[in-house]
């Protein structure tokens, strides 16, 4: 079937997951040729942008979600939100929320802009080579993947998109800057705020962060805040394409 086009038959699927779940970007098969749901998994790895951390920044995004999970869990069970012996308060939570929501915001806004330009300014698009070699649901997937890869500092792409143009080079550069440097500033600010606070010894009222329950809570926060933010656009692209096969 079409999923075998441009494929390395041995470890292509495993490598497509490995390269997108980290800031790797190398490929041994064409991601654009994978089946729609496989493409969705590849994109979600970068859109969640948490599991294994990124080159040069490590698990900063994961720690952002831990801060959010600690704060929410503390409010739910009536215990003091603490992490590593430091109180997690409103200032840290606000910064963590901003950082967590910036990633989907940047990706979705720029995908909307590119879709608008493609639809309403066809002359400009034609002057840059036409951009899309695939229309419809898959065309939207190609645009979404391009900005997702840029935001996650990945570098892979759905290569049916003609992206070596002024528009794509400039907009992807802007996305990369916004999605990489602003979160780092926010995460370092959280570290600075926590470093200024006094160490609080663990007590009966301390929310334990080394339990299975807290791990499940952290996963739920990641799923709700990160993954579900992209459900509407996937419903219009990868999921819709899958259902149309």
Q: Where are the regions a protein language model picked out?
A:
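Hydrophobic core segments of alpha-helical transmembrane domains in multi-pass membrane transport
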Residues: 65-74, 100-115, 188-192, 217-229
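Alpha-helical transmembrane segments and their helix-start/interface "positive-inside/aromatic belt" motifs
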Residues: 88-103, 209-221
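Single conserved hydrophobic/aromatic residue that forms the stacking wall/gate
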Residues: 1-6, 11
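Extended, low-charge hydrophobic alpha-helical regions
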Residues: 108, 112-160, 164, 171-177, ...
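Short amphipathic alpha-helical coupling elements at transmembrane boundaries
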Residues: 16-19, 42, 46, 82-90
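Juxtamembrane boundary at the C-terminal end of a transmembrane helix
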Residues: 229-245
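Alpha-helical transmembrane segments
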Residues: 75-89, 189-210
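Pore domain of cation channels
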Residues: 30-77, 160-195
């Amino acid at each position: 079937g079409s999923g075998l086009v441009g494929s390395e038959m041995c470890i292509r699927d495993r490598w497509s997951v490995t390269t997108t779940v980290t800031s790797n970007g190398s490929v041994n098969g064409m991601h654009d040729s994978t089946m729609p749901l496989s493409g969705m998994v590849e994109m979600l790895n970068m859109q969640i942008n948490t599991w294994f951390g990124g080159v040069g920044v490590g698990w900063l995004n994961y720690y952002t979600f831990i801060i959010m999970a600690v704060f929410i869990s503390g409010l739910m069970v009536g215990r003091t939100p603490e992490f590593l012996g430091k109180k997690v308060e409103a200032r840290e939570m606000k910064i963590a929320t901003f950082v967590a929501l910036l990633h989907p915001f940047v990706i979705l806004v720029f995908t909307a802009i590119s879709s608008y330009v493609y639809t309403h300014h066809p002359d400009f698009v034609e002057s840059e080579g036409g951009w899309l070699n695939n229309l419809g649901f898959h065309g939207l997937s190609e645009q979404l993947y391009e900005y997702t890869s840029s935001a996650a500092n990945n570098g892979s792409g759905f290569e049916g998109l003609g992206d070596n143009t002024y528009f794509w080079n400039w907009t992807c550069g802007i996305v990369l800057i916004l999605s990489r440097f602003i979160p780092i500033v926010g995460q370092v600010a959280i570290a600075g705020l926590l470093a200024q606070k006094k160490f609080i010894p663990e007590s009966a009222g301390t929310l334990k962060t080394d339990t299975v329950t807290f791990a499940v809570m952290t996963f739920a926060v990641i799923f709700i805040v990160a993954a579900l933010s992209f459900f509407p656009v996937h419903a219009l692209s990868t999921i819709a394409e899958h259902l149309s096969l």
